Design a protein with these regions (language model features):
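Composition-driven recognition of glycine/serine/threonine/acidic- and proline-rich low-complexity segments
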Residues: 2-12, 16-17, 26, 30, ...
Length: 237
């Protein structure tokens, strides 16, 4: 089965089938809001490539994200195979959480590299030791992302240690995270690790949290011109 993430057209079609609303993405999130989420993702997750390079000893490339609207049911229908779900909760600066989803086979490559291998020993189960190795990589990655986000939003932001869970979309639900038919935001990134991994990761978040992030960015944008005007006024005096 093709493991590429959903295209915009596929998501729109699936969303239309689920709730009977055409152009659902524009209704739920405006183009400006999606652009803002893309900018946030690009600066926060995108800049963590340097951190991963240090950990994995391979060149890491994370591309500009694609922001789309989907549901868990839609994802389950398209990707009936194992993933590792990485839950990240904000403990300071922001209120909420999001879920990073990586394919299990990609997690095995990361685990092998973290444990000193060359990334090819992937015909193994993700036992506690390997899951811990993946967790450390995700902790460093999301910590770097939080630092970048803190700089971007000009406020202190802290996160809790990521919690990892193995999820098989063919048989499991994301109970405790999202409802099966809940409309959510999917911020997807293409990630390359040397010649070993050419895949994608998904950052899933509730609509409310996505809008919450955008509001923080908008508030910052509105504050900056006001501060500049005050400085100009003081200079003229």
């Amino acid at each position: 089965m093709d493991e590429q993430l959903l295209s915009d057209d596929e998501i729109k079609e699936l969303t239309k089938d689920n709730d009977g609303v055409e152009n659902a993405e524009e209704i739920i999130l405006t183009r400006e809001e999606r652009d803002a989420l893309g900018e946030i993702g690009n600066i926060s997750i995108g800049t963590s490539a340097t951190t991963l390079y240090t950990l994995l000893r391979n060149k890491v490339k994370i591309t500009t994200p694609n922001v789309s609207i989907t549901t868990i049911n839609s994802l389950k229908n398209m990707y009936p195979f194992p993933f590792i779900a990485v839950e990240v909760s904000y403990t300071k600066g922001l209120s909420g959480s999001n879920l990073m989803i990586i394919k299990e086979k990609d997690a095995k490559i990361i685990a092998d590299l973290m444990m000193g291998g060359d990334g090819t020993n992937v015909d193994v189960e993700l036992d506690d030791m390997r899951m811990s190795a993946v967790g450390e990589a995700m902790n460093q990655m999301m910590g770097s992302a939080a630092t970048s986000l803190s700089t971007m939003l000009k406020k202190d932001i802290n996160i809790s240690p990521p919690e990892l869970t193995r999820i098989n979309f063919a048989t499991d639900s994301l109970k405790g995270y999202f409802k099966e038919d809940e409309t959510i935001v999917n911020v997807s990134f293409k990630m390359e690790v040397g010649d070993l991994l050419n895949s994608e990761i998904m950052q899933l978040m509730p609509i409310e949290f996505a809008k919450y992030l955008v509001e923080h960015l908008y508030d910052l944008s509105e504050t900056a011109p006001a501060q500049e005007n005050n400085m100009d006024s003081n200079i003229q005096k």
